[in-house]
Regions:
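N-terminal secretory signal peptides that target proteins for export/translocation
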Residues: 1-6, 210-213
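Gram-negative bacterial Sec-dependent N-terminal signal peptides
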Residues: 4-24
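PGST-rich, cysteine-poor low-complexity/disordered linker and tail segments that act as flexible spacers
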Residues: 27-39, 46-47, 56-60, 80, ...
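Short beta-strands within extracellular/lumenal beta-sheet-rich domains
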Residues: 52-64, 112-115
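Extended extracellular/luminal ectodomain segments enriched in beta-structured repeat modules
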Residues: 65-72
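Aromatic- and Gly/Pro-enriched, solvent-exposed loop/edge beta-strand patches characteristic
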Residues: 76-158
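A short, hydrophobic C-terminal helix/tail in secreted or cell-surface proteins
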Residues: 184-203
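C-terminal membrane-anchoring or membrane-association module
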Residues: 200-213
């Protein structure tokens, strides 16, 4: 009898672990990745700057198929001074300027540094990850490769415009968002119910054994 109880306990534990795994959220989902293999950008470095001669800001688009939140952002942005990195809404082939959905201010950003924002929740749609220079910032956002991987955008004092050249790769960026929680299949629900009943039966059996002892 003792062996049978131990066997049932192991079965119950296995079923419960399976139910927990079914409810666990999956790892984050990458929705934009313009980095090359090995995460070492080697494409054209596009300037990000603002000084007396003018300015240039850079943005890359990404699309979400469902509501989610941003887990991490990796870019090749690098430079000296202050710059704002954040999310802008989309209007046609360019970002909507001047209205940050979310942003963070960086000082002397270093290439390939990961940011982990909190509370950056977005609905389904197309957005832009943008770097907008403070006055005096001098830096660059290097393309991941020299191969065309899609249009992006740049801005001067007159606003945003699309970059459609097939000779320049998109600036390197990787955006990871929270994945949807896995929904158990009907068979998994049955296993969870069976596991719960089995645990209850084991508890009753142990209670009866103590009372008889």
């Amino acid at each position: 009898m003792q062996i049978q109880v131990h066997t049932l306990s192991r079965i119950a534990a296995s079923v419960l672990l399976a139910s927990v795994a079914a409810h666990a959220s999956a790892a984050g989902t990458v929705v934009l990745d313009t980095y090359p293999l090995g995460q070492d950008p080697f494409g054209w470095p596009s300037r990000v700057f603002a000084d007396d001669s003018g300015r240039q800001d850079i943005a890359v688009p990404f699309t979400l198929t469902s509501a989610t939140s941003v887990q991490s952002i990796l870019t090749s942005l690098d430079g000296l001074g202050g710059v704002t990195l954040g999310i802008l809404a989309s209007q046609g082939s360019t970002p909507v300027g001047g209205a940050w959905l979310y942003s963070t201010h960086l000082t002397d950003p270093v290439m390939d540094t990961t940011l982990s924002p909190t509370g950056w929740s977005l609905g389904a749609g197309t957005y832009w990850l943008a770097a907008v220079a403070d006055t005096g910032f001098a830096g660059q956002w290097q393309s991941g490769t020299e191969d065309y991987s899609g249009d992006w955008a740049q801005a001067d004092a007159n606003g945003w415009s699309a970059v459609t050249s097939t000779f320049i790769g998109m600036p390197a960026a990787r955006i990871t968002v929270a994945a949807a929680v896995a929904v158990p299949e009907p068979g998994t629900y049955a296993l969870m119910l069976a596991g719960g009943l089995l645990v209850a039966a084991l508890a009753r059996r142990k209670s009866n054994a103590r009372q008889q002892g």
